[in-house]
Amino acid sequence: MPQPSSATLIRQVFNVLTTIVLCSAVAGVFVSFRFPGTWIRSGEILIAIYDRLFASRKKNDHDPEAVILEKQTSKDTVGCAVGWREEEDIFERCLEALKASDVCAVVVGVDGDTTEDMPMLGVFGDVFPDAPPPIHLDTPVGDALLDAESAIAANIDQLLSIVETQITTQLGIDRSQLCTIDAICIYQPHRNKKAILLTTFLAGIVMARAKQVPFLFSCDSDTVVAPQTIDQVVASLRPRPQAGGASGRISTWKSNQSFLCKLQSLKWWFDQDVSRTQTAATGFLECQPGPSCAFRATALEQVLITWYSASAWGRRCVTNEDRDLTAKLLHAGWEIYYVPHAVVWTDVPTSLAGWFKQQLRWSRGTHFQRLSSHGLYTTMNPYFTMYVMKDMLMPFVACAYLVWFVLTGERFLRLSEYDLAVSLLVELIYTLLTAADRIPWTDLVYLFPSYIFYSLTKPAIHIWSLFTMFNNSWGNPFDRGARPGLTMPEYAWCGGWVYLTLAASLKALSESMNYKKRNAINETFAVVVFPSLLALGAISAWHLALTRPKRRWTEQVGSVV
C-alpha cells in the first residue's frame, strides 16, 4: 500500500523556490510582454500537446501482462450512483447506463427519506425489477462517525460492519449471500452529498469485498455513462498498483438546449483538454469530478474517514467533496489518472441563476480544499503548484486591474483587447485541429462568446465564493420547480461586477478615439458616467433583491450544514 505523501525538507524548499521562480516568470510575462494572455495560453496548449504525444504514451507503456489486464470487462467493478430528488427521466437514464455497462453490481444512494424522495426509489425498482427492496438507514453513517469520531476514527472496518449489518439484516440474508445481489439501493435522512457519498462508498466496498473485486466507479444521478467508459477508466488502474483513482471526460448532454448550455459545453471541452491534461503531464490531478471517477477499493478504505471528518478553522465543508477526496488520495501517496477518451454526459443548468449557484458551490469547495490542504502543495511538482497559485490569484489581479484602469486609465498589466482577440484565435485554431471529430462545426461559433462569458464572470464568482466559503449545500436542483433565487448580497455583487466591466469597456473604447475626444470622454466619465454607473448598479441590485422570489435557495435545496 502506498505511503503518505512526504518529501524531505530540502525537497520541499526546492519545490517552494522553484514555484516562486515559475510564478515570477508568469508575472513577468504579464508585465513585460506585449500579448501576455496569448503567450500564457499558447504555453498551456503546448504542454497539453506534449502530454498527449509523449507523456501519456510513456505512462501507457505497460508490460504484456498489463495489456491483458486492460482487456478485462467491467465485471471487476462495482458501479455507484448518488443523488437527491433527481428528475425521474434523468435518473432512469443514469441507472440504465450503469446497468448496460456490465458492472458486477450497482449501488445507489439517495439522500432523503421523505415523500418527495420516493420517486427515485421507484425508478430504481423499475430499472432493477429483480433487486431487493431499498434499504433505509434511520441515521446516516456519517452522523455516527462524527458523533463517535474518537472511538472509530482509526477503524474503517467498523464502519463497513455497520453498513453490512444493515444490509444483511434488512434483506434477511446471510453475509455469504451478498455476492448474489446485483443491485441495491440505500436511502437515508437528507444531509448533503458528502454524507450520502460516504454511505454509498461504504456499501460499494462491502459489495466489492463480497464479490472479490478491486474497483469502484462512481457517478452522479444526472450522469449518463457511455457503454465502454467504466472499463476504459478502470483500465488505467488495473496494471498500476500505485494508482488509486482515475476519471474520464465530462460532456454536457443538454448542449443543444439553450445558449448557456452551448457556452458550458465549449468551456468544459477546452478546460478538460488543456487545463486538466497539462496538470496530468506533471503526474497530478487536482480533482476527480463526481460525474466520472473510479477508485481502487483499498485506496478508498484508507482515506474515507479522514476525508469525511476533515475540518479546518473549526468548520466542515461539504461542497466540492470530489476535489477534497482527490487531495486525500494524493496525500496518501496514490496516483490519479485522467482518461480523456472515456466519456460521460451530465446535466447542466439551463438558467443563469442555476449556473451561478453551481459555480459558487464548486468554487467555494475549491477554496476550502486548497487553503486547508496548503501543506500538500509543497510536496507536489512545482509546475502543478504554480498552476494552482495562478488559478487562485489571477481573478484578484483581474479585479484590481479593472478597478485601477477605470479609476486612472492606466494599465499595470499589458493586457488589451487585441491580446484577448489573439488569445481567442489561438484557442480557436487548437480547437479546430483537435476537436473536429468531437465537436460539431456549427458549435464552434459559440467559442468566442464562451471565452468572453467565462473570462468576465470567473473573477466575480471566484472572489465572491472566497468570502462565502462556508455556505454549503447540494447546489441543485438547477431548473426544477421555482426559479432559484439569489440573495441580496449576491445580486449586489453581480450588479456591481457587471457595471465595473461595462465601465472598463467604455474606458477602453475611449482610448481608441483621437486625443481631444478621448480627453472629453475621460472627463465626462470621471465626473458623470462612473458615479452614475455605481449608483445605477446599487439601485438595480436593491431592486432585484426586493423583487426576487421569497423562497430562499437553501430552502429549495435542503438544509445547510
Residue ranges and their predicted role:
Residues 11, 15-22, 26, 44-51, ...:
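Short hydrophobic helices that act as membrane-entry/anchoring signals
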Residues 1-10, 461-462, 475-484, 556-561:
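Short, low-complexity, Lys/Arg-enriched N-terminal segments of secretory-pathway carbohydrate enzymes
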Residues 1-11, 21-27, 383-386, 483-490, ...:
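Juxtamembrane membrane-interface segments at transmembrane-helix boundaries in membrane proteins
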Residues 30-41, 388-473, 490-561:
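Membrane-embedded multi-pass helical conduit in multi-pass membrane proteins
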Residues 6-10, 378-394, 479-503:
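Loop-to-transmembrane boundary segments
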Residues 369, 373, 470, 474-480:
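Juxtamembrane amphipathic/hinge helix adjacent to a transmembrane helix
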Residues 63-385, 389-393, 560:
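Non-transmembrane catalytic domains and loops of membrane-associated enzymes and transporters
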